[in-house]
Amino acid sequence: MSTQKPLIALAAGGTGGHVFPAEALASVLLDRGYRLALITDKRGAAYGGTLGKLETFRISAGGIAGRGKLSALRSALELGLGLIQARSILGRIRPAAVIGFGGYASVPGMGAAALAGIPTAIHEQNAVLGRANRLLAGHVRRIATSFAEVSHVEPKLAPKLVHTGMPVRAAILASRDASYAGITAEGPIELLVLGGSQGARILSEVIPAALARLPEALRTRIRIAQQCRPEDLEGVRRAYDGTGIDATLDSFFADVPERLARAHLVIARAGASTVAELTTLGRPAILVPYPFAVDDHQTANAHAAEDCGGAWLMQQDSFTADSLAARLDSLFTHPEALVRTAVCARNVGRPDAAEALADLVVGLIPNESGA
């Protein structure tokens, strides 16, 4: 007679950066036969993919820090209500372990699990421990990290740290076997521009102007796929008119893994998922961190990628058409630098991140280590 595997609860919600690793972990745990439940906020009802198939419990959740007294009070009340709701849910479903993925949506579920003595872990996607995870770090058993080094971690919590890497989508892993094909002497130059979940206007303004400054012999070899905000598409299209550049523009690319696989160079923001996908595939990138990200975590992510030789960091305030044109001219005329950077990026990639994170979570459960 077969024995039913334990139930594991995932506490995740909010933006894609918190949800993508939860999705990847869920796929691995389901493949291993574990039962799963999702504890999330109101946005969790819209999830598709693997998370959309899980038994889902929606709870109240508020921001960690409000912008004013009234906002802070409202957030505290929502968190308190969410904690009560989460305790009730955990009492009913009785999970063997709970793992959170940062963001305020994870706080009530993780807090309730810690109070109930349920084994817990959190996963930090960025190179800076996020505010929600900082609040929870002292109360969980393990802190899984995407980057080898993470700031804003109290020294006394260092023994809890486990570098698992950042889980990426299955489609990215499927493209990992595509080796980096360097730029040939006369061949096309494949350039991919990703602006984050909603595009980035600075990229739409600077990149066409920078490419227009390149020598014609280089410019006419460029094939660019660029993500833009919907309202910027027409203006960017006009900017490329007459440049001789083959430009494919859209507000969303459904085939990002395939485009990443064939790119000679990527220009992008420095979100955790983007950096993880670039290093998993081993693709060189120019990273332009979003300067207003909480705790400036994108700059920390970009520094981590640059420090290992896997990317070039360009701060937004110095990301101009002239500076970018000079950088691109150098890279495209000396493509061996792109090859070296691709190798370095791949060397720090963690294609096993989802499996490593699953091992960590399973290891929290008595009698399940090594299962």
UniProtKB/Swiss-Prot annotation:
One of its GO terms (molecular function) is undecaprenyldiphospho-muramoylpentapeptide beta-N-acetylglucosaminyltransferase activity. One of its GO terms (biological process) is carbohydrate metabolic process. Its EC number is 2.4.1.227. It comes from the Bacteria. Keywords: Cell cycle, Cell division, Cell inner membrane, Cell membrane, Cell shape, Cell wall biogenesis/degradation, Glycosyltransferase, Membrane, Peptidoglycan synthesis, Transferase. It catalyses: di-trans,octa-cis-undecaprenyl diphospho-N-acetyl-alpha-D-muramoyl-L-alanyl-D-glutamyl-meso-2,6-diaminopimeloyl-D-alanyl-D-alanine + UDP-N-acetyl-alpha-D-glucosamine = di-trans,octa-cis-undecaprenyl diphospho-[N-acetyl-alpha-D-glucosaminyl-(1->4)]-N-acetyl-alpha-D-muramoyl-L-alanyl-D-glutamyl-meso-2,6-diaminopimeloyl-D-alanyl-D-alanine + UDP + H(+). GO terms for cellular component: plasma membrane. It is a peripheral membrane protein. Pathway: Cell wall biogenesis; peptidoglycan biosynthesis. It is found in: Cell inner membrane. UDP-N-acetyl-alpha-D-glucosamine binds at T15, G16, G17, N126, R169, S197, Q298. InterPro entries: GlcNAc_MurG, Glyco_trans_28_C, GlycoTrans_28_N. The keyword Methyltransferase does not apply. Cell wall formation. Catalyzes the transfer of a GlcNAc subunit on undecaprenyl-pyrophosphoryl-MurNAc-pentapeptide (lipid intermediate I) to form undecaprenyl-pyrophosphoryl-MurNAc-(pentapeptide)GlcNAc (lipid intermediate II). Belongs to the glycosyltransferase 28 family. MurG subfamily. NCBIfam families: murG. This is UDP-N-acetylglucosamine--N-acetylmuramyl-(pentapeptide) pyrophosphoryl-undecaprenol N-acetylglucosamine transferase. It comes from Paramagnetospirillum magneticum (strain ATCC 700264 / AMB-1) (Magnetospirillum magneticum). The gene is murG.
